[in-house]
Design a protein with these regions (language model features):
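Short nucleic-acid-contacting surface segments enriched for D/E, G, S/T with interspersed K/R
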Residues: 90-102
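Structural detector for short beta-strands of small beta-barrel domains
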Residues: 45-66
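Short linear proline/tyrosine/threonine-rich motifs used for host-factor recruitment
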Residues: 74, 82-86, 103-107, 111-116
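Short, aromatic-rich amphipathic segments at membrane interfaces
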Residues: 107-143
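Cytosolic juxtamembrane N-terminal segments of multi-pass membrane proteins
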Residues: 1-15, 120-132
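Polytopic alpha-helical membrane-helix bundles and their juxtamembrane interface segments
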Residues: 4-44, 149, 153-220, 257-259, ...
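Acidic surface patches and DE-rich sequence motifs
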Residues: 62, 66, 76-78, 95, ...
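Hydrophobic/aromatic-rich structural module bridging two neighboring secondary-structure elements via a short loop
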Residues: 218-270
Length: 409
């Protein structure tokens, strides 16, 4: 193992030292940021004095619950003041009032806390204080998480430097730096009782693993499928947390995870004779492309119609038109995704075209959902897909006289 890293790590001493120093600084930044955030969130609150009672109005736009929800959060607002009250679904159904009397308390360090009752306990004060501080310090936590993932990115490019070109390393690290910046500027809000910090962690992991997987595919490396398994696990977690994109979640469970394992085996059996790290790739015939397009259209209509008829609680509140649009876009994305998975399994160049379509459809969903950090991932998709398509095309052209490049009828 040590000999492997010695043979593949960055050969230029100056650059290698610089990358190690950057990794150490990122690690320190991550520890300091997360440590500071945890210290603030878990700080003991000695006392909280009552300030005043306030009438707050219920914000119904943030509500979309069904019997599947055991806990229903209702938000009340008054200017910039906010109170979130958790109800059981049974109590939520019978909740008719659009206003509530909130009680404002202030801690010894000036933090304002709001409750729906007086005579609060120390445990209630501590819990509310922790939630408020976690929301305030979300950019700090996001920076700490992103710095740690960025450190791993730098180390990968250092330890496997000889496996990547300068362009590939620059592309990979640029996307991760951009994701770090976006995660700090646009922190995620909580959803379905899950703190926005956890959601951002999933987004950053999804970005990191996806672009690494994309890069390995463009290099015709079978190891992309090992990374892809981690991608599927993260994306399933995202679907569960946000309660959305159910077509994608089912497709991931029943199709992508099995196809990743099978594809790894298949690619391992078709190594390039001259370069064992490469896998032999090829392309489709025209009529086969038409059949694929027809299949995608049929899948989109059938699956979209089926899921739109289900009574499922989503993270898009009460906007029925938006929910339906997301369902059909997601159905189309899942159809293209399945085609993409088969293209990758059969080592077909057309998988890059499928990547283009998937990236566009998912970018639309990300914009609608306000998932801005994932737009960085889509930017990475578009740029690397172009790179991968050109790279595979050159390989196919150079081997056209040696190997069959089209699937026989």
């Amino acid at each position: 193992m040590i000999q492997f890293f010695k043979a593949n790590m960055e050969p230029r001493k100056g650059l290698r030292i610089a990358e190690v120093i950057i990794s150490i600084l990122l690690c320190v930044a991550s520890i300091v940021s997360i440590g500071y955030g945890m210290f603030q969130v878990n700080a003991n609150v000695n006392d909280a004095k009552f300030i005043q009672s306030i009438e707050m109005t219920r914000d119904r736009e943030l509500e979309d619950y069904s019997e599947d929800n055991t806990v229903c959060d209702v938000t009340y607002i008054s200017g910039d003041k906010q109170l979130v009250v958790s109800y059981s679904y049974e109590d939520y159904v019978h909740l008719e009032d659009d206003s509530i009397t909130a009680y404002e308390y202030e801690t010894d360090n000036g933090t304002k806390l709001y409750f729906d009752h007086q005579n609060i306990t120390d445990q209630e004060i501590q819990h509310s204080y922790g939630q408020v501080k976690a929301n305030e310090l979300a950019p700090v936590f996001n920076f700490g998480i992103a710095s740690f993932i960025l450190m791993i990115s730098v180390l990968i490019m250092t330890l496997f430097a000889k496996q990547f070109t300068t362009y590939e390393k620059s592309w990979f690290l640029s996307i991760m730096v951009l994701a770090t910046i976006i995660s700090v500027i646009f922190p995620e809000e909580s959803a379905n009782g899950v703190n926005g910090i956890i959601i951002m962690l999933l987004y950053l992991l999804d970005t990191f693993l996806n672009i690494l997987c994309e890069l390995l595919i463009s290099k015709q490396s079978r190891f992309n499928f090992l990374v892809s398994v981690l991608v599927e696990i993260v994306e399933i977690a995202m679907c569960v947390v946000l309660m959305y994109r159910f077509a994608t979640m089912v497709t991931t469970l029943l199709f992508w995870l099995p196809i990743d394992i099978i594809s790894y085996i298949n690619w391992s059996r078709h190594k390039d004779e001259e370069e064992s790290e490469l896998t032999v790739v090829r392309k489709l015939k025209g009529y086969q492309e038409v059949l694929v397009i027809v299949g995608i259209v049929v899948w989109t209509i059938v699956v979209g119609y089926f899921i739109s008829g289900l009574d499922i609680s989503t993270d898009f509140y009460n906007n029925q038109l938006l929910e339906t649009a997301i369902i059909y876009i997601d159905a189309c994305a899942s159809a293209v995704g399945i085609a993409n998975g088969l293209f990758i399994f059969f080592r077909l160049r057309e998988q890059w075209i499928a990547w283009y379509i998937c990236a566009f459809l998912e970018a639309v969903i990300n914009v609608i959902s306000g998932q801005y950090v994932l737009l960085v991932l889509k930017l990475g998709y578009f740029t690397n897909t172009t790179y991968g398509y050109i790279k595979w095309s050159k390989y196919i052209q150079s081997h056209s006289q040696e190997k069959q490049t089209q699937i026989s009828a």
